[in-house]
Design a protein with these regions (language model features):
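Short secondary-structure subsegments characteristic of cysteine-rich extracellular domains
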Residues: 28, 102-104, 294-300
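Proteolytic-maturation and junctional protease-sensitive modules
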Residues: 1-45
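Cytoplasmic, intrinsically disordered regulatory regions of membrane-associated signaling receptors
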Residues: 41-43, 194-335
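Short secondary-structure junctions and interdomain/linker hinges
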Residues: 1, 73-76, 253, 313
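Intrinsically disordered, low-complexity regulatory regions enriched in Ser/Pro/Gly/Thr
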Residues: 19, 29-33, 75, 167, ...
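Hydrophobic alpha-helical transmembrane segments corresponding to the first two to three helices
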Residues: 29-31, 35, 39-44, 48-192
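Conserved, structured regulatory domains from eukaryotic proteins
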Residues: 7, 19-20, 25, 135, ...
Length: 335
């Protein structure tokens, strides 16, 4: 008897038995074996990092392509952002930019380990999958650590304003941003050595698409969802402080279209750095929520790249205006 591995592409229709496809699936069987191993290489989607839901096969396929395109664009944009940071001396001397670039590195790690995770899960190497799962979890936690530090840095700039000097400020931020995730991952490994590895995207279908991630549901909920909740709440408060600050600065001033547009882009840029869009994950139990979550968060790195480019153009424009003012004030030199 011949057996073939397939994936269910039905939507619970009456003709669901016709909706099976072997595309992307490989049947692994040797003569004499009593079981068949199926290896399917269908892409997964960004929402699995937060929510264990089960969209229809057609929606899952679309979400997978959205994630692939979004993460690829983000990885490209983040790489260019690093080059822009290195090539501009003013960026390298700016403390805020150094905080931003740390978040950029964390997002690069996240995308680098998320994109091949499903492909690695389809391989037979358990140790490689464990490494990928551990690295992916660490990268996600580091990303949220740096987004929280973005909120803290914003608090110092907008609320404290004066007397904000902190000795070895960037070193202390780095210890928290990179060290806390390492401690959390180490504790998970100490408590449960099998906490990382092959993890089905849909828990109700263990033979379906899988990635290398946290296998222990409790560890995932406590470390991942717990940290995301805390960071999201803190950064929402920081965003509220920013809005209040912008409103107070505009009081007594004549508002125009230009200033309003500038404030909107400022808030959008800050929201991206603070990871506010990750809050959509709490409402992504629906298919529509999954689409919004995947689009916004897979593109987070690319949006940060656009924000960096706009900041660079703004800095260059300001420098040009200063040079023009200096030349106008000094006037032509007499012989």
């Amino acid at each position: 008897m011949f057996s073939d591995c397939v994936i269910d592409e039905s939507n619970s229709s009456l003709l669901s038995w016709l909706d099976y496809s072997s595309d992307g699936c490989q049947t692994l069987w040797r003569r004499g074996q009593t079981h068949i191993t199926c290896s399917c290489d269908h892409l997964t989607y960004f929402g699995v990092l937060m929510v264990n839901s089960s969209p229809s096969p057609s929606d899952q396929k679309i979400l997978s392509y959205i994630t692939l395109i979004g993460c690829s664009l983000s990885l490209f944009g983040l790489s260019i952002t690093v080059l822009l940071f290195i090539s501009h001396k003013k960026f390298r001397a700016d403390v805020s930019m150094k905080v931003h670039i740390s978040l950029v590195f964390a997002l690069i790690l996240l995308n680098v380990h998320f994109l091949p995770s499903e492909m690695v899960a389809a391989l037979s190497s358990t140790s490689l999958c464990v490494y990928m799962a551990l690295a992916l979890h660490y990268s996600l936690l580091a990303t949220f650590s740096w987004m929280a530090l973005e909120g803290f840095h914003l608090y110092l700039l907008l609320v404290r304003v004066f007397n904000i000097y902190i000795r070895r400020y960037l070193l202390k931020l780095s210890v928290v941003g990179w060290g806390v995730p390492a401690v959390i991952v180490s504790l998970v490994v100490i408590i449960d050595r099998t906490a990382y590895g092959y993890t089905p995207v849909d828990s109700s279908n263990p033979n379906g698409t899988a990635i290398c991630y946290v296998t222990n549901t409790t560890a995932m909920m406590v470390t991942t969802m717990g940290m995301i909740c805390l960071v999201f709440l803190f950064n929402v408060i920081m965003l509220g402080v920013t809005v209040r600050r912008l409103i107070s600065l505009r009081q007594g001033q004549e508002t125009n279209r230009s200033s309003t547009t500038k404030d909107i882009f400022t808030l959008l840029g800050i929201s991206t750095l603070l990871g506010i869009t990750w809050g959509v994950g709490f409402f992504s139990v629906t298919t529509a929520g999954q689409y919004v979550f995947c689009i916004l968060n897979s593109l987070q790195g690319f949006l940060i790249f656009l924000w960096f480019v706009m900041s660079l153009r703004k800095a260059q424009k300001a420098a040009a205006e200063i040079r023009n003012d200096t030349q106008t004030t000094s006037g032509p030199k007499s012989k």
